[in-house]
């Protein structure tokens, strides 16, 4: 089977936005116009083609990024719909990693919102070119130029309109194209009757002003165009398009367009912009990787001629075909039924079948080429972030890094039957989502699940019930506290048991000191003259690592500590690895009195958006939750409060905010850093954990 679309005519794009900016609706319309859907599904009726998991339809938010393929004007457009809710940022990071370009959807009334900023930052990290689509132009309070202003103010991005709306709210009935100098008028709500006309007289002046600004902005990034512009020469439509494309693909410029996906206005023009301005796999830099043995850096170009290399970016469990592994092909060709090497794990895998996804239906294909996105059935050991490559030409593509979970809950199966199924369900779910962890607490025997926020864990429990038919009771959320040392000290650990028969003897002196934040635990051996034999030194390190897991104050993991073994003694007969392990853990316990241990708690960056009149109440509430207000600003007719609040104080905040603002306030939070807890709180935590 030969290639259906050339690499040049392929676009891999993501659609990213704040929750409720209308991202799923926009994707739906794209699928509708490219002939993939026969009936349009409305998100607020719960029938959207992209939101294919049951809970997504119920909550009206997108959770897993479904990868869909569509066709438009002789191009293949692969779309990854990414979630806009802050608890799912890992999904967004994961999809951005494999995209060549993205469409950032904004709500015309609110402009750039907190989650938009988070997603935008992630896209900048991965160097993803973007187009901005100002959606919901039909909504009350829609303001296109205000939205463009928020892109400059809040994202500091070089964004310029390449279109202007004709009218807004109920009056929104057309779009001015500044590049082609024409207008498109809509006569019906299905958006199928579009008339290309001259720019209406009353809009000409504004259009000229903004076209001038656009040309100036593009010319600043293109010397040749700058010369023409300064000499007063006419810049042709083709030259302007080429200039915008070049500046957009090099992530120096972001074109802004407008429309209303719900009213089917501007969607076809959005598709044209994707093809005109977002990069094909040939326009983005070759992917970098390393050779597994030597770690030497190499590049793989986007070409069918190169050896096969792909990155697995998502695992899903499908009720009909089992485990689906979504992957992006960076180079080469892959046929179904062939073998590949998972170079990250060093395992050989057989690709049973290759599927191309259309939101919730799928078609089986026999071959995928460079630049394609597809799903494989039959991979056993592959997880998110693994590289799949040709067995004869190994490479490891840079993998992705995921944040540690910040919140955990205990979960108990309701019956014996549920208990057996729960293990399977949890292992499948943690395979799909690297920020979700499940483990058994050694002391209590409880199963603990951990994730990125309350909504994240709610949805996991919900999926267990729906997909795996496991009923479970969920405990109160627990915060992932940590402990660390604030002072340095030299302490002794001595373990001696010599009562008849072979004894046990281990003796160490260890210097503990605080390490830099985020550096973790570092162990050094500074013993001179063999006072502790070489073979026992790893046991000292291992003994400390084991003991660190259960902390010294309240049983939370100890982090960011340096330990150096400086002295000790041993016994020819009675010393053993076990004895030195125990001696090391005794030294750690002895450090409590000397190293000033403290408890650390996760601090969340919280943004609350509220009407002005509730400002006082909300500020008071934030302070009562041990929060620090870090800034305020007016956003449209609302006030935004930015604060740093401990996670432990944020449980149930959604309910409190609703009642404080009669349901008119919204908030979002993301994990920011760990901070020392105040003494009074620390005492409470210690008491509670010791069961006093």
Curated annotation (Swiss-Prot):
It comes from Bacillus mycoides (strain KBAB4) (Bacillus weihenstephanensis). This is Elongation factor G. InterPro entries: EFG_II, EFG_III, EFG_III/V, EFG_IV, EFG_V, EFG_V-like, EFTu-like_2, G_TR_CS. It comes from the Bacteria. The keyword Protease does not apply. GO terms for biological process: ribosome disassembly. Residues 8-282 form the tr-type G domain. GO terms for molecular function: GTP binding; GTPase activity; translation elongation factor activity. GO terms for cellular component: cytoplasm. The keyword Hydrolase does not apply. Pfam families: EFG_C (PF00679), EFG_III (PF14492), EFG_IV (PF03764), GTP_EFTU (PF00009), GTP_EFTU_D2 (PF03144). SUPFAM superfamilies: EF-G C-terminal domain-like (SSF54980), P-loop containing nucleoside triphosphate hydrolases (SSF52540), Ribosomal protein S5 domain 2-like (SSF54211), Translation proteins (SSF50447). Keywords: Cytoplasm, Elongation factor, GTP-binding, Nucleotide-binding, Protein biosynthesis. The gene is fusA. GTP binds at residues 17-24, 81-85, 135-138.
